[in-house]
């Protein structure tokens, strides 16, 4: 079952991520049906509300993912702006992606609250990896939507992530391989029984 679930998830990610981008205002129905779809939104970043997700690695180097609040149409969302390298030691803060508060257009993948990357948020309880957006909202005293954006690019190129959030590895893993082996084995057994009956 794990292999089948993973295969279905991988298929969904692959199909959604290959669709052309769509403007946020053109989305209709349940927002969950657009997870992993590339969307565009116009608004402004609020650099007074930023958070770092620690325990993130890139090319073997320790770092963080930088999340910044984004304001649009009287609504708020968190935007994952990609990986930033940690400072030389615990006392040196990382060099964050630049932010300005001018109105810009951003392009990114729509993600659901429950699919936030694993890790630990600064100043946020790590008791659960679920509903982390809600935890961020409570810590920062804001109310955001129940989705967030993995930033891909911005109309102001200086705000493009140096290391964007990558799609998860789309591997079905060993569970699917085992499942296919069992299906193949079962087929051989059925075929063998029929062959025995014919020769009997």
Predicted segments with their positions:
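Surface-exposed, charge/polar-rich loops and edge strands
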Residues: 1-200
């Amino acid at each position: 079952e794990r292999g089948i679930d993973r295969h279905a998830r991988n298929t969904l990610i692959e199909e959604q991520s290959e669709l052309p981008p769509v403007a946020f205002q053109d989305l209709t129905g349940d927002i969950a049906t657009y997870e992993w779809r590339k969307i565009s939104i116009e608004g402004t970043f609020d650099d007074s509300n930023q958070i770092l997700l620690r325990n993130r690695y890139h090319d073997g180097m320790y770092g963080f993912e930088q999340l910044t609040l984004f304001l649009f149409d009287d609504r708020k969302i968190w935007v994952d702006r990609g990986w930033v390298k940690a400072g030389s030691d615990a006392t040196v803060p990382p060099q964050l992606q630049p932010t300005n508060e001018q109105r810009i257009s951003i392009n990114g993948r729509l993600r659901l609250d429950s699919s936030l990357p694993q890790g630990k948020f600064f100043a946020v309880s790590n008791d659960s990896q679920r509903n982390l957006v809600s935890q961020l909202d409570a810590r920062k005293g804001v109310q955001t939507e129940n989705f967030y954006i993995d930033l891909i690019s911005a109309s102001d190129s200086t705000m493009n992530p140096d290391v964007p959030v990558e799609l998860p590895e789309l591997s079905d893993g060993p569970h699917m391989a085992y499942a296919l082996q069992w299906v193949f084995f079962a087929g051989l057994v059925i075929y063998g029984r029929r062959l025995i009956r014919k020769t009997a």
